[in-house]
């Protein structure tokens, strides 16, 4: 239904062979309100939906409703603002007191004011609905909302130069040697030379950060600063590569090549930037 994207700011919704899509995905895309979502949950508790019967209205979303959907990708500088009042200095120790250099305000926009103005982000329109062919069991597009490569690249480029990403990339501002905290707690002396990376905003504690306790102090430790920056769209490094063979012979040749590559890497002979496939 609809049309395949012709412009960078257009997107498609991918559904299953029977036009199905998960209720969670529908809710995340704003196509299923709370009342209908709860009713679907109750239907499941009561034995589910009769596959031979008529579908209940809460489980059906019309194509016309999907094709009228619009979404907005706001740049970091629109949803993250520098908190100079509570975090006047670029001192990572302030994060130990529950303060952060940036405040997330993305959820504070009025419901009807979700259109990005020039330079604020990318406005996206759903133009088509794609369905997997019966003879296919996989494809390059995943179920749900799929953006064009041009949209993703534009969004990443816009966020790479944002204030919060630049702050995260400056290790002098976003991290501290744990040994420097020994005046606060003597146990930190045992972590001399270990750098502690702090999240730039409170909501980022859920994006690549875990909570740790050192002595009497509870701090947020990043799994890795690289992952935190990626969560902010501040890294254009390729995340994954999908290879599709044209036939079974090519598939076997490809798998043999990858096995040889991994064996070569495992033997210690080398790798491509430390990457095994």
What does each model-found stretch correspond to?
Residues 1-274:
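Basic-flanked hydrophobic alpha-helices used for secretion and membrane insertion
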